[in-house]
């Protein structure tokens, strides 16, 4: 795969190690529709769309330039994907996904990423899964504790190079109400 990048987007010089670890940890198949939340220039969404071409893939990011690059990268790599400029889940209201993939923007702060986790839990279809990668030293254990308040199942599926890949399933029934308090 070939990716266009630019200044002002995350990991513009090379594939982020966390993204690489997340993609390698995914199972043999994932269910669609798929959301790449905080897509940046589209690495995760494009890789998933290329690996499973029959899946409906949506990519969302707050950064307009990142969205433009994600569209370009999907086109370059022959992947059909919808790309939305969205502050978190704002442009996705009412949409539901079977799989949500995320390399969260840690530098945005805990309040922002925890809001994204809560909104993700509320945006899953029944049986859906939220997959994310986070470095241990950047808060993976505390993120797991928070995720356990949203999901019945939170598992570490991979630990590699200081990165933890988490898979969360079975959002609590009251997750949509809980997102109002984040």
Where are these regions (language model features)?
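Conserved SAM/SAH cofactor-binding pocket of Class I
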Residues: 17-102
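Core SAM-dependent methyltransferase catalytic element
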Residues: 159-182
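A short glycine-rich, Lys/Arg-flanked "PGG" loop and its adjoining helix->strand segment in the class I
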Residues: 114-126
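Conserved beta-strand signature within the Rossmann-like core of class I S-adenosyl-L-methionine
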Residues: 127-134
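Class I S-adenosylmethionine-dependent transferase superfamily signal
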Residues: 48, 120-121, 147
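Short beta->alpha hinge that forms the Motif I/post-I loop of the SAM-binding pocket
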Residues: 61-65, 112, 135
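Non-catalytic substrate-recognition/targeting regions of SAM-dependent transferases
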Residues: 1-13, 174
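Conserved class I S-adenosyl-L-methionine
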Residues: 135-150
């Amino acid at each position: 795969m070939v990716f266009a990048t630019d200044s002002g987007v995350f990991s513009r010089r090379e594939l982020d190690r966390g993204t690489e670890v997340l993609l390698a940890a995914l199972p043999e198949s994932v269910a669609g529709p798929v959301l790449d939340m905080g897509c940046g220039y589209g690495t995760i969404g494009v890789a998933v769309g290329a690996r499973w071409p029959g899946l409906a893939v949506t990519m969302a990011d707050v950064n307009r330039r990142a969205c433009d690059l994600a569209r370009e990268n999907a086109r370059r790599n022959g992947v059909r994907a919808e790309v939305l400029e969205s502050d978190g889940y704002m442009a996705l209201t009412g949409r539901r996904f079977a799989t949500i993939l995320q390399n969260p923007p840690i530098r945005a702060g805990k309040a922002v990423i925890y809001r994204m986790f809560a909104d993700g839990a509320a945006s899953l279809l029944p049986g859906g899964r939220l997959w994310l990668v986070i470095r241990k030293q950047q808060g993976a254990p505390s993120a797991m504790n928070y995720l356990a308040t949203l999901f019945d199942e939170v598992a570490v599926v991979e630990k590699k190079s200081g990165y933890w890949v988490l898979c969360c399933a079975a959002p609590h029934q009251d997750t949509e109400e809980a997102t109002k308090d984040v």
